[in-house]
Design a protein with these regions (language model features):
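Short, flexible/disordered intra-domain loops and linkers
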Residues: 45-51
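A short, gly/pro- and small-residue-rich
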Residues: 55-57
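Active-site regions of metal-assisted phosphoester/phosphodiester hydrolases
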Residues: 1-35, 43, 59-60, 64-231
Length: 231
């Protein structure tokens, strides 16, 4: 069984307006996933330092970041990052450039975990519905160009308020939705903005949102997770 999760950490800023990366790491340790896609993991302005300092990740968790190395002291690309549990092999990684007017993007990592090679995509999509559909098509086209038969897990903040429409329709036919439940707003979750999709070779065993007291305070989103097996 492989557990994956996605979490928009809002640059470490909690619902109490306190910026506490230690609290984000506590929540990640509570979720205890093998692979985590993060959104808003870097500050947006200035040098765009990571909202989760690298030395803090090393000292207080069992994770290491996929080294996208877009900027010194940044964790990812436009705030998109992937953490993997130590012992998981990172085979390849890259940035996916998306059509966007605002700073949005996606990242991809090919990994080997528990004897299985997988492709992991983390993404944070646009506020515009038209642009979101373009971005999902772009992500799917780019990963299909990279060995379409590799089992794939796509995770992130899709910013899609529709329950079934909008950009979600772009996944139909190629991917299954892990029904994780509403993740936004963390104080009173009503919208499924954060999603996990898997390709056909992956079986979804269970899925949900992580709703601990600390998670409700650490960000305005709750983490979503799924436990998976491979056929």
């Amino acid at each position: 069984v492989l557990k994956v999760a996605s979490y928009n950490i809002r640059k470490g800023l909690g619902t109490d307006r306190l910026r506490r990366p230690d609290r984000i790491l506590d929540v990640l340790n509570e979720v205890d996933a093998d692979i985590i896609a993060l959104q808003e993991a870097d500050r947006r302005f200035g040098k765009r330092h990571s909202a989760l300092p690298l030395d803090m990740i090393t000292a207080h968790s069992d994770y290491e970041p996929v080294p996208f190395e877009t900027r010194p002291d940044s964790l990812g690309h436009h705030g998109n990052a992937i953490l993997v549990r130590r012992g998981i092999t990172i085979l390849a990684h890259d940035i996916l450039h998306l059509p966007a007017l605002e700073p949005r993007g996606a990242v991809v990592a090919d990994i080997r975990a528990k004897g299985q090679e997988l492709r992991i995509v983390g993404m944070h999509l646009d506020l515009s519905g038209f642009r979101r559909r373009q971005q999902v098509r772009s992500v799917l086209a780019q990963i299909n160009d990279r060995a379409p038969d590799m089992p794939s897990i796509l995770m992130g903040d899709l910013n899609e308020w529709s329950r079934k429409g909008g950009c979600l329709g772009e996944f139909i036919g190629g991917h299954h939705d892990a029904h994780t439940g509403p993740s936004f707003h963390s104080q009173r979750p009503m919208a499924r903005l954060d999603r996990i999709f898997v390709s056909h070779k992956i079986k979804i065993l269970s899925a949900g949102t992580h709703q601990s007291l600390k998670a409700r305070r650490a960000s305005d989103h709750l983490p979503v997770w799924a436990e998976l097996s491979f056929s």
